[in-house]
Amino acid sequence: MNTKNLFFALLASMTALTATAQETYQDTKLIGNDLNGTARYVGMGGAMEALGADISTMTSNPAGTGFFSRTQVSVTGGLVWQNGVESHSVSGGHKTNASFDQIGIVAPLKINGKPCINVGFNYHKSRNFDQILTASGALSMASQNKLSAIKYDKVGEWGWNAIDANYQKILEKTDDQGKKYMDYYNGQAFDFGQYQHGYIGVYDFNISGAVSNSFYLGATVGIHDVNYRSSSTYFEQLEQNTNGASAERLKIDGTGVDIKVGAIFLPVDGSPFRVGLYINSPVFYDLKLRGDAGSGFVQYSGSNLSSNNSSAYIRNYCNYEYKIYTPWKFGVSLGHTVGSYLALGATYEYSDYGSIDNRVIDGTYYDPWNGSAYDTSSSDDVMNAHTERTLKGVHTLKLGAEFKPLPTLALRAGYNWVSAVFDENGFRDGSLESPGSGYATSTDYTNWKATNRFTLGLGFQASKNINLDLAYQYSHTNGDFYPFMSYYGDTNPDNNCIVRATKVSHDRNQVMATLSYRF
């Protein structure tokens, strides 16, 4: 059996999807938002939190919908694709995917024929998880199974996960004195492939309006629907004519709720210059992660452990439900218009990712009045401390402009800069005595750096009531990939398990179209 066939055996044995737990690197998938919404919003780089008058602003600054004087319905869809990647031979994946991005309505409620307050509903895809990630590199005196062997001697002090348990079942031995120990193979090279897909869909319910001609307020309640899927495979070329393999299937489902409030005011009489301020509460998530891990070896003739070609693999899995409370988000935005032909916007946002609250469900509360049952939870202090060390405060800058050379034609451009989420020295710590580490079914992680986004857009007024908007977005992020955490023991390389970073990048393109109807 060759290494690739071993992988197919591992994947075939993983028929029931099961679960892992809350963990710093998994958390970040739920927090960061893509630049998505209507094509007009994306084409202007999303810098419309002060300009308003776009349905997508209800998910950041809810006061933005207060500028609508007519009912508007809009729907958005398009394509997303990656540059410079190929589907991995085992984990698979699609480079190009269709995406349904947005649908919503804003309607003014009128009293005596005059607009009084606006109400709105909008669905948008806040995260599109479609991504192929591949990495390969050299190993020296290190391997995934060696890290498990080092942890074996520290059981009771360090966390023990599904990968460790798999290797233990294959490599655990007993010496002449009857003492158990865990053997290992040093690695020479690795190859990793992952296909992530799914989305987070946000259903926003909005109310907004003008307190005066120069002051607007708004509030939004958001329901977040999490659908995350991942399939990853990991090969190691090992010493003694041996190859190693591990595979993971991961599924995250759940819901969350948040509240957004915001204001827009015009500080200068007679001037269209606007200032927007807004606060987004944490998203209070209830989540279920299901994961399955398989690990194994192929030993060829000549190995000192086998005189004939042979293979061994084992499967492990776990179930876990938990809660995550994401950080607060604060934003300030500036907007200005010149006549009816030029609009300029700038937005700054800040969110402290290190303040994520990972929570463990530790009981059930029964309400004696109505007989309902509710989960009770407490903070996972160990994982929260790791999150605080590993993640940083994230700054987002959004710039956008719209120019109308004709009343029926708009040209748009935008730019985003999102600072790095991870500390450059951060790592996925599999030794933590936390459910997030103990229930893990993989060891890899990537420290992604800052993200740059560039956008272009076109707007066409097809009639008095119909608009067609188009947008293109390119985003680029570099990162450092690690197949597992490093362990530094002492000057003896046999007591170390050190892996160097492999440079990776994520280049994504998106084209989208929005059809809007006003009445």
Language-model segment annotations:
Residues 1-25, 519:
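Bacterial Sec-dependent N-terminal signal peptides
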Residues 14-15, 71, 405:
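Alpha-helical transmembrane segments and their juxtamembrane interfaces
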Residues 39, 51-60, 65-139, 198-201:
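Outer-membrane beta-barrel translocator/receptor signature
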Residues 22-36, 106-519:
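Outer-membrane beta-barrel porins/channels
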Residues 32-50:
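N-terminal targeting signals for Sec/Tat export/insertion, comprising classic cleavable signal peptides
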Residues 7-10, 24-35, 88-93:
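Generic N-terminal amphipathic/basic segments
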Residues 3-4, 60, 401:
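Residue-level micro-sites within transmembrane alpha helices that shape
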